A protein has these predicted regions:
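Transmembrane beta-barrel domains of Gram-negative outer membranes and organellar outer membranes
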Residues: 21-157, 164-200, 214-296
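Active-site-adjacent structural elements in folded domains
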Residues: 203-205
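Bacterial Sec-dependent N-terminal signal peptides
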Residues: 1-22
C-alpha cells in the first residue's frame, strides 16, 4: 500500500509537470521571481508544490540547552500542496495539503527512511499522516505582498508512537502563516519573511503537543543573478509554548539553498539547514528538495 501511495503521488506530479512543460514559453519575468509565497493566484490559476524534507540527527539538547550525542534518528516528510485562485481580484485562494511520513530510529542510517517500511518493532514507521484544507488571502488590499494562509490539519493516524517510533502528531492543528516580501529596486535581491503559528488542541493523552502554541518566525534573503536562478540564505526559529500540557521546546536553524526555473511553469529547489542551538530538542540537519508548477 505504501508503495502505491508514493507511486501514485509521483505519477500525479509527473503528469502535472509534463503538462506544465508543454505550456512552456518565454516570459519577461520568471514565475520563480514573481510568485513568492506571499503572492496570490487569479481565478483559474493553479499552484502545485511537491516538497520533500529529510531531517536526521545524532545530537540533541536538554531543557537547559546542554548538548549530548544521541543514536541517529531520521524523519522524512513528503508533502503535496495544491492551491487555486477563486476570483479575478487575486484576494482569496483555496487549497489542500497532504503529508506522507517515513521515520526510523535506533541508529539506522539516514537513507533508511527511503525503504518506506512500516514495522515499529524494527524501528521504522511510514504512512499518510494528515490532510489540511487551507485558505490564503490578502487582508490589506493596498499591500498585496502581505498575505495570510490558514490551514486546519486533520490527523489520519491512530497512534502517535508505536514501540518507541514516533510517526506524526496525533492532534488537530490550526496553522496560520503570515507572509511578506520585499524586492529591491535592482530586482536582484528579495527579502521574504514569514511568521508561522500552530495551535495544537485536543486531549493531553492523545498527543505530546496538544494544548500548546508553536511560533516560528523566519527570514529568507534571495539573490537573483538572473530571472531563472536564485541562491538564498535563511534563518528560522521555533518556539513551542506550553499552555497546559507542560511541554516546551525551542530551536534555531540556519541554512542556504538554490532555486532554478526549469520551464516557464516549473521550478525546483534544493535547501540545506542546520539546527545550531535549542532547548529540549534534537540538533540535526535537513536536506530538502521541491518541485513547483504554476499553471494557467
Amino acid at each position: 500500500m505504501k508503495y502505491k501511495v508514493l507511486l501514485g503521488l509521483l505519477n500525479f506530479c509527473c503528469c502535472v509537470f509534463t503538462q506544465a512543460q508543454e505550456k512552456d514559453s518565454l516570459a519577461t519575468k520568471s514565475n520563480l521571481f514573481t510568485f513568492s509565497p506571499s503572492k496570490l493566484l487569479t481565478k483559474g490559476q493553479w499552484d502545485i508544490k511537491w516538497f520533500n524534507n529529510l531531517y536526521t540527527e545524532v545530537r540533541g539538547a536538554d531543557k537547559s540547552g546542554s548538548e549530548s550525542d544521541r543514536m541517529r534518528q531520521n524523519f522524512f516528510t513528503s508533502s503535496l500542496d495544491v492551491f487555486t485562485g477563486i476570483n479575478d481580484s487575486k484576494t482569496i485562494n483555496v487549497g489542500l495539503s497532504i503529508e506522507y511520513r517515513s521515520n526510523t530510529i535506533n541508529g539506522m542510517d539516514a537513507l533508511s527512511v527511503f525503504k518506506f517500511k512500516n514495522n515499529p518493532t524494527q524501528s521504522s514507521r511510514s504512512g499518510v499522516t494528515s490532510i489540511a484544507p487551507s485558505i490564503k488571502f490578502s487582508p490589506i488590499k493596498q499591500v498585496s505582498n502581505f498575505t495570510i494562509q490558514s490551514a486546519f490539519h486533520i490527523p489520519l493516524i491512530s497512534k502517535e508512537e508505536l514501540s518507541g517510533v514516533f510517526l506524526d502528531q496525533k492532534g488537530f492543528i490550526w496553522q496560520n502563516k503570515f507572509f511578506y516580501d520585499y524586492v529591491a529596486d535592482s530586482e536582484q535581491f528579495q527579502i521574504f519573511a514569514e511568521v508561522n503559528t500552530l495551535y495544537s488542541f485536543g486531549k493531553k493523552s492523545a498527543s505530546y503537543a496538544n494544548d500548546s502554541l508553536g511560533v516560528a518566525p523566519g527570514v529568507f534573503v534571495s539573490y537573483f543573478p538572473n530571472q531563472n536562478f536564485t541562491i538564498l540564505g535563511l534563518v528560522q526559529h521555533y518556539n513551542l509554548i506550553a499552555i497546559n500540557n507542560g511541554f516546551a521546546q525551542n530551536y534555531t536553524a540556519v541554512g542556504a539553498g538554490a532555486k532554478y526555473q526549469l520551464t516557464r511553469a516549473v521550478n525546483f529547489e534544493l535547501i540545506y539547514t542546520n539546527f545550531v542551538r535549542g532547548n529540549d530538542t534534537g540538533l540535526g540537519q535537513t536536506f530538502n528538495f521541491g518541485l513547483r508548477a504554476l499553471l494557467d
